Amino acid sequence: MLSWIFWILLSITLHELAHGWAAIWEGDYTPIETGHMSGNPLVHMGGFSLIVFALIGFAWGMMPVRPWNFRHRRWGDAIVSVAGPAMNLLIAFVTLTSLGIWLGLDSTMLQHGQPAWKEHVSNFLQLGGFLNLVLFAINLLPVPPLDGSRILSAFSSTLRGWYQHPNAGMAGMVLFFLLLTTNAFDWVVLLLGTFAVRYTAAIASIF
């Protein structure tokens, strides 16, 4: 439970900070002006997200930006949007690589089991890597208000107009929760889990 809380809070914070860093690079200093370039996860999550986190153990964050300040009018929003999932992917690779090295340096852990404290370390790293792979995939879904919708809108004015509809965000969230409750996302989770295991094993084999 504590590991889950740690990884959720860290992943959300770094995800949102990545959006902020990209926005600043694009010429928008709103993240600094609003005090959101902070390592405090409470700054990014907000009240409703915290309530949902307390109830079901999942949450989300927000980084305020002003797209009209971006240097690249068409691609700026896509650049800022892709920065968040890219951060999740980076966390996943760093964590899974660390897990592979951890296991590879002590091959007896794979053959004869692990002492309790070593198993805790392995589980901790495994959770962080897998969770961030899932967050990467979820955020790339082309469903507003997820990052994937903003990335895709850069390639199509028609999609951009639809995504900017006042009800698009609500419709997108309903569709997103339907995907989760109907297990339509399960095959993606299975694919990511398989990748995580094989990647970790490949790293471990080097050592």
Language-model segments: which ranges?
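Hydrophobic transmembrane alpha-helices and their immediate loop junctions
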Residues: 1-207
